Amino acid sequence: MTQSSTARSLPDAPQPAPEKGAWPKPSLLIADCEFIKPTRSARELCILETLAQDGSLSQQKLGQSSFLSGAMVNQYLRTLQQKGLVRFVPADNKSYTYEPTEAGEDLRRSRYAAYSSELVRLYSALKGCIREKVASLETKGIRKIALFGASETGEVVLSALADTQFDVLAVVDNDPEKQGKMFKGHVICSPEALHYLPIQAVVITSFGHQDAIYAQIAPLAAGKGLEVMKL
């Protein structure tokens, strides 16, 4: 690209109206995190990953995937261009589309591999923490348990318990829309099922509503002599 073309301002390229539900796309990053905050490298990866899928996206759409303002996306794009990782392709005399260069694609692949490796390590560490947490039940001779909460956390707990001595007899949830559906090999039941199941403990797998769920099942737990564990 010539010097004159790179000196132009970088307004958003005009875009056709997206299909309903097309945006926002799933992002590699997690918004509003206290402990796992995106680094500059992670944001660059997110932008490169998004551009690899569609280089005609506006800066607004790029900002949605990387949780950046339009002005910040503009700065990131300029930096990536200066590093030879992204090229600006004129769409008309006012706007651009953005394409990863060969070097940019190489960087995207290597960073994606490193990013995925970190996530796998984090996932493994989380499963280890869960196994350590529920080990106190095992020392009490408890084997037959139910999980309360058919959520993503519940999926992690089921995975963590897969190679243990625990026998998960049921997964229950308060949401009527979930009840009756399959969840990782279990049919999601109403909490009423806890009255009839031959369980020894209930593990609450909802981080967001642990106290409310604990209060909900406390009378049943007292009546049946069940252990109730919050994660």
Q: What are the language-model segments listed below?
A:
Residues 13, 20-22, 33, 168, ...:
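Short linear motifs in intrinsically disordered/low-complexity regions
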Residues 1-30:
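Long, low-complexity, charged/polar intrinsically disordered regions in eukaryotic proteins
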Residues 23-46:
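Short alpha-helical segments that sit at the start of domains
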Residues 42-56:
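Short amphipathic alpha-helical interface segments
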Residues 52, 60, 65-85, 91-231:
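Hydrophobic, well-ordered beta-alpha structural blocks that scaffold small-molecule cofactor pockets
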